[in-house]
Amino acid sequence: MDRIVEIEKVSFESEFEVSLRPSSFDDYIGQEKIKQNLDVFIKAAKKRGECLDHVLFYGPPGLGKTTLAHIIANEMAVSIKMTAAPMIEKSGDLAAILTNLQEGDVLFIDEIHRLSPAIEEVLYPAMEDFRLDIIIGSGPAAQTIKIDLPKFTLIGATTRAGMISAPLRDRFGMDFRLQFYSTAELSRIIQIASVKLGKECDKAAALEIAKRARATPRIALRLLKRIRDFAEVNDEAMISHERAKEGLNALGVNSLGFDEMDIKYLEILLDAKRRPLGLSTIAAALSEDEGTVEDVIEPYLLANGFIERTAKGRIASEKCFETFKIKLNRTKGLFDGE
């Protein structure tokens, strides 16, 4: 099922997202503590004439991990090479990437927790000693060839930090957990982006979109792009509050940022009446894979206190019952009459 609020777990930014991407910490809205710390570490590395230590970003998708990697490269005045762990199937794939890096380059690996143990073994000496160990042959006749690599900064990104092996995680000099964005931060992002798109939002419209964007910039920008279409076909020079509400309702995104998949998820838990349900049971009921449920659907519901994870499974919170139980039993849908 296609969802306007869904974010792919492994994806590089679209041309649309790239065109709106900030290029410096000054332009980047949100994640203030992370920006402040990175700014210090980058300035210190440049002052010493060294590469920045390896960096790990983790957190739900769409919060700006890729954007921060690009800003780091910009601030260090170096090139950035992009890849994703599922694309690195063999040690030779990683060797080809590493040997093509230039001195000081940034290597960005998305969903780094999906690297196989064999690939990790190749990566360890590259991260620690900037050296590539290639084994030729097998058994007693096997030989190891050592190839020196240029010094580089590895930036790993993941939505599943708990699945990163301890040896790999220990080799990162710094790690940062990205937080969900406030409505005010998203509203600013939307207003700036709307100007770049040539269809400016008024403040009320930007705030309305922000409230329904699941605290996630990528979703906010996706919603803005679609709302712009509603304004365009109505020959409106600016996106008004009423037009934003109309478009968001038409897209099936309610006032809390929930769509039909979220509501179906919550209905499953509410029908269980506080009886814990396992991830596999919920995924089967939604006809989704477990990874999508855990990485894409649940984080926002957890962060906002609508569900709870227990040792026995997931349950609907008291807040969920208070907020939705009556609405979910109505004949009228959650998306009607917003």
Swiss-Prot record:
Keywords: ATP-binding, Cytoplasm, DNA damage, DNA recombination, DNA repair, DNA-binding, Hydrolase, Nucleotide-binding. It is found in: Cytoplasm. It comes from the Bacteria. The keyword Lyase does not apply. GO terms for biological process: DNA recombination; DNA repair. Residues 1-181 are annotated as: Large ATPase domain (RuvB-L). ATP binds at L20, R21, G62, K65, T66, T67, E128, D129, F130, R171, Y181, R218. GO terms for cellular component: cytoplasm; Holliday junction resolvase complex. Its EC number is 3.6.4.-. SUPFAM superfamilies: P-loop containing nucleoside triphosphate hydrolases, Winged helix' DNA-binding domain. SMART domains: AAA (SM00382). One of its GO terms (molecular function) is ATP hydrolysis activity. The keyword DNA damage applies. Its main location: cytoplasm. It catalyses: ATP + H2O = ADP + phosphate + H(+). Mg(2+) binds at T66. It is an enzyme of class 3 (hydrolase). The RuvA-RuvB-RuvC complex processes Holliday junction (HJ) DNA during genetic recombination and DNA repair, while the RuvA-RuvB complex plays an important role in the rescue of blocked DNA replication forks via replication fork reversal (RFR). RuvA specifically binds to HJ cruciform DNA, conferring on it an open structure. The RuvB hexamer acts as an ATP-dependent pump, pulling dsDNA into and through the RuvAB complex. RuvB forms 2 homohexamers on either side of HJ DNA bound by 1 or 2 RuvA tetramers; 4 subunits per hexamer contact DNA at a time. Has 3 domains, the large (RuvB-L) and small ATPase (RuvB-S) domains and the C-terminal head (RuvB-H) domain. The head domain binds DNA, while the ATPase domains jointly bind ATP, ADP or are empty depending on the state of the subunit in the translocation cycle. During a single DNA translocation step the structure of each domain remains the same, but their relative positions change. Belongs to the RuvB family. PANTHER family: HOLLIDAY JUNCTION BRANCH MIGRATION COMPLEX SUBUNIT RUVB, PTHR42848. NCBIfam families: PRK00080.1 (NF000868), ruvB (TIGR00635). Homohexamer. Forms an RuvA(8)-RuvB(12)-Holliday junction (HJ) complex. HJ DNA is sandwiched between 2 RuvA tetramers; dsDNA enters through RuvA and exits via RuvB. An RuvB hexamer assembles on each DNA strand where it exits the tetramer. Each RuvB hexamer is contacted by two RuvA subunits (via domain III) on 2 adjacent RuvB subunits; this complex drives branch migration. In the full resolvosome a probable DNA-RuvA(4)-RuvB(12)-RuvC(2) complex forms which resolves the HJ. This is Holliday junction branch migration complex subunit RuvB. It comes from Campylobacter curvus (strain 525.92). The lineage of its organism: Bacteria, Pseudomonadati, Campylobacterota, Epsilonproteobacteria, Campylobacterales. The gene is ruvB.
